[in-house]
Amino acid sequence: MSDNRRRRREEDDSDSENELPPSSPQQHFRGGMNPVSSPIGSPDMINPEGDDNEVDDVPDIDEVEEQMNEVDLMDDNMYEDYAADHNRDRYDPDQVDDREQQELSLSERRRIDAQLNERDRLLRNVAYIDDEDEEQEGAAQLDEMGLPVQRRRRRRQYEDLENSDDDLLSDMDIDPLREELTLESLSNVKANSYSEWITQPNVSRTIARELKSFLLEYTDETGRSVYGARIRTLGEMNSESLEVNYRHLAESKAILALFLAKCPEEMLKIFDLVAMEATELHYPDYARIHSEIHVRISDFPTIYSLRELRESNLSSLVRVTGVVTRRTGVFPQLKYVKFNCLKCGSILGPFFQDSNEEIRISFCTNCKSKGPFRVNGEKTVYRNYQRVTLQEAPGTVPPGRLPRHREVILLADLVDVSKPGEEVEVTGIYKNNYDGNLNAKNGFPVFATIIEANSIKRREGNTANEGEEGLDVFSWTEEEEREFRKISRDRGIIDKIISSMAPSIYGHRDIKTAVACSLFGGVPKNVNGKHSIRGDINVLLLGDPGTAKSQILKYVEKTAHRAVFATGQGASAVGLTASVRKDPITKEWTLEGGALVLADKGVCLIDEFDKMNDQDRTSIHEAMEQQSISISKAGIVTTLQARCSIIAAANPNGGRYNSTLPLAQNVSLTEPILSRFDILCVVRDLVDEEADERLATFVVDSHVRSHPENDEDREGEELKNNGESAIEQGEDEINEQLNARQRRLQRQRKKEEEISPIPQELLMKYIHYARTKIYPKLHQMDMDKVSRVYADLRRESISTGSFPITVRHLESILRIAESFAKMRLSEFVSSYDLDRAIKVVVDSFVDAQKVSVRRQLRRSFAIYTLGH
């Protein structure tokens, strides 16, 4: 039985050997013995367990062939493979790229990575384009070699892919995703939010392409490339900020402007990369100077006040204005941070450091340990970081409200752009960040809000001409500017402006003249860049109580473009100048500006000036003349600008002014501070029956005019009373009284029409326009006359000894003359302006004298004051 079985197996083996392909070479095996012809019943082939029914499978032909073709690599000649052979150990020069490779820039490296990723994606897509039916059908088919048909089909597809140079290579060079999305298709948002839509790869590439075309192709009316010139200027100055006008982007590509307003953080990242690429077209090696270019957005159309910011503005672009009140030092902030694992020494990162949260490493990717980790100071990238406090400008705070403030973060080259006291305009991203102290204070989760500045500019003069009409009560339009010029051509414009100062206050023409001169101001000068001369006019109002001094100060506060009100008792030296306090977060000393610093390029109003102590008053000496405040406290040595006019009101000693005593004995002010006031107005509450009657009539009429709805009732009541009295009296007498009253009213109305006050809103804009646009020059003036006046004033001052006259008063005459020229919107100071200025200074000097010499001085200086 076993012999028959063995014979049958031998026949099967011979049949399988004959079935080999005829082209197959004859198989040679070690020992000259064919394993197929070996006896099956040999001990090597018998089941070791002795089971006759189970035998080992016959070895596969391929496996046997592989075993027979093996080469012993560990023989005695193995070391000869490593011996040097100079004839063969040479590389083919055609196959070796030994050219020097330049270091790629960050933008070029990202572009190549994106191209390689896209190529790999296309290869994967083409390799698996068969549908399921074809795969199932191919899996069931075998070729004559026994290989699945599907594999051969895929192999052919790879071969076709390599051979289709014209189609595939062109697709790799030109990104097909860029061709799929156009600028119009970007508006069809296919995501839950703008942020998700922008971060999609095809959308971000399309946005980058359109932004690049905008920077390279946008032209002005003359056909000149706007941003090409700015990029060249950026390269010449080695700057890292490129200013982009938002209105230009909105006109050229509106959908991108919408994305920028809604998702500024994502858009600015793309914009910065595009700006770097555009800059490298002009300066290929610019990345060696600055690794990044920051796009600064300007002229954003919507301006918010700090109190108008709400949760709907979070993560969007906002534009706010305010005054910088506090500024921290400059700190290095982590941007891209790398860590060293102290156990295995590997470097982890880089990780992008966001301003909202701190990066924490949980474990090392190399050794899987949980630390400790240390920041790699050499490979970590830092950037400048600074925080400033922005407060609402004094003129924009609603009545009865406290000014709001916000923290603003300045990064990169924006640090130290502004100083405390400067009014700035910030365009940035309104963000929220976690504040543990705020949560503990409120007892429930809330977030603090900050503004991450994108651009910051100091506000200089008017901004309405840039397209912001109607946003500010002090801005003007072109039509209003023509109205200003028309008003300035009036011969009596100076008297009309003086009459328009505090029209609800009767009389005090000298005070109104001084206030008008202070509001318009003179022209600051810088002599050869070495010595600066102030152009602001300081005024001191000294007089009896109840003479409307505080009312005039309040009027100036509402009229001036920028005014800060302070009182003598409530203001200290640091409150007026500057203070140094410790920052609660960084524990460093920071600088905060006082009232004079906040009133920079405006007016500082100080009531109850006599109530200040001498130490506090001496602190403003430097601010009144040099218009700067020097600080040297807590290791901070700096100088702050205080370019403002000071209008102060004070009461005399004892409550009332004594005309029999000189000025120095009526007020407890020292000569150094008195000499710093350009105009001194002494107000006396004298008893004059006629003047008191006119004052009472004016006050009553003011109250009556404030209730216009009662005019008709009052007229009807008067007619009724007149009718009843006509019955009792004769008609002739009544008619005579009515005619006399009518003539008196006509004379009063005619006088009011001759000098009608300018509307307050128009006057505010007129003053601001004159301060920012008009800079009159001293040309063809009678300087000898000024010299004579100064000499006469000095002589009389020494003889009377009541009011000191210094060289500052000589400069005051010129400043006041320039202010009168500004009232006329004139480019030159005329002799008429000079005569008015001399009269103001002389009257100020004479009124400060005691009554015994006042009349004599008026006669002495009549030659300078008559006719004005």
Curated annotation (Swiss-Prot):
Residues 1-65, 87-106, 704-728 are annotated as: Disordered. PROSITE patterns: MCM_1, MCM_2. Changing residue 676 to A: Loss of MCM2-7 complex helicase activity. CDD domains: MCM2. SMART domains: MCM. A zinc finger (C4-type) spans 341-367. Residues 49-65 have a biased composition (Acidic residues). The modification Phosphoserine is found at residues 14, 16, 23, 164, 170. Changing residue 392 to K: In allele MCM2-1. It catalyses: ATP + H2O = ADP + phosphate + H(+). The keyword Metal-binding applies. GO terms for cellular component: CMG complex; cytoplasm; DNA replication preinitiation complex; MCM complex; nuclear pre-replicative complex; nuclear replication fork; nucleoplasm; nucleus. Changing residue 367 to Y/F/S/H: Loss of activity. InterPro entries: MCM (IPR031327), MCM2 (IPR008045), MCM_CS (IPR018525), MCM_dom (IPR001208), MCM_lid (IPR041562), MCM_N (IPR027925), MCM_OB (IPR033762), NA-bd_OB-fold (IPR012340). It is found in: Nucleus. One of its GO terms (molecular function) is helicase activity. Its EC number is 3.6.4.12. It is an enzyme of class 3 (hydrolase). Keywords: ATP-binding, Cell cycle, DNA replication, DNA-binding, Helicase, Hydrolase, Metal-binding, Nucleotide-binding, Nucleus, Phosphoprotein, Zinc, Zinc-finger. A motif (Arginine finger) lies at residues 675-678. Residues 493-700 form the MCM domain. Belongs to the MCM family. Present with 1690 molecules/cell in log phase SD medium. PANTHER family: DNA REPLICATION LICENSING FACTOR MCM FAMILY MEMBER, DNA REPLICATION LICENSING FACTOR MCM2. Acts as a component of the MCM2-7 complex (MCM complex) which is the putative replicative helicase essential for 'once per cell cycle' DNA replication initiation and elongation in eukaryotic cells. The active ATPase sites in the MCM2-7 ring are formed through the interaction surfaces of two neighboring subunits such that a critical structure of a conserved arginine finger motif is provided in trans relative to the ATP-binding site of the Walker A box of the adjacent subunit. This is DNA replication licensing factor MCM2. It comes from Saccharomyces cerevisiae (strain ATCC 204508 / S288c) (Baker's yeast). The gene is MCM2.
